Amino acid sequence: MKILITGRPGVGKTTLIKKLSRLLQNAGGFYTEEMREGEKRIGFKIITLDGEEGILARTDLPSPYRVGKYYVNLKDLEEIGVRSLERAFQEKDLIIVDEIGKMELLSRKFREVVEKIFDSEKDVIATIKKSSDPFVEKIKNRNDVVIFELNEKNRNSLLNEILSVLKFNRGEKQ
């Protein structure tokens, strides 16, 4: 089963992904987390479910790749994030991707591994931006994808809804 979680920035997509990854067995992949200095967001970390960390983007990073005010670190994205997805593809039942967004899509290797996991029989839970990017649209428009939109009203109930759908689907496979 392929599950996409979308919603406006700051609504809680990463929080939901982290809760799901703790509750579900045999999961691999990564999530992103804000980096702050005081009240100011200065970048994003990439953290694998195995605990490996790297820098996805920072405001002061020497990089030719930029999204808004953030300079994207393709090296850590590919060596930590992409590698965690490849490892999860080989070893796990469930693959977590937070997120399929502008920064991550700068990497050809990231796009290739996302296509590979979505074309596989593996269960996938990913967060995805509301975007008009052709790659994002291709993923969203797949027949095997279920999209959940997270908002303030369903923030507390969506966790159980996704768990129920996933467990029901896994039960049908057996």
From Swiss-Prot:
GO molecular function per UniProt: ATP binding; ATP hydrolysis activity
Keywords attached to this entry: ATP-binding, Hydrolase, Nucleotide-binding
Coiled-coil regions, chain positions: none
Protein residues bound to ATP: 7-14, 94-101
Reaction it catalyzes: a ribonucleoside 5'-triphosphate + H2O = a ribonucleoside 5'-diphosphate + phosphate + H(+)
EC number of this enzyme: 3.6.1.15
Protein origin, superkingdom: Bacteria
Pfam families noted in UniProt: NTPase_1
InterPro entries: AAA+_ATPase, Nuc-triphosphatase_THEP1, P-loop_NTPase
Cited HAMAP family: NTPase_1
Function, in words: Has nucleotide phosphatase activity towards ATP, GTP, CTP, TTP and UTP. May hydrolyze nucleoside diphosphates with lower efficiency.
Family named by the database record: Belongs to the THEP1 NTPase family.
Protein name: Nucleoside-triphosphatase THEP1
Organism field: Thermotoga maritima (strain ATCC 43589 / DSM 3109 / JCM 10099 / NBRC 100826 / MSB8)
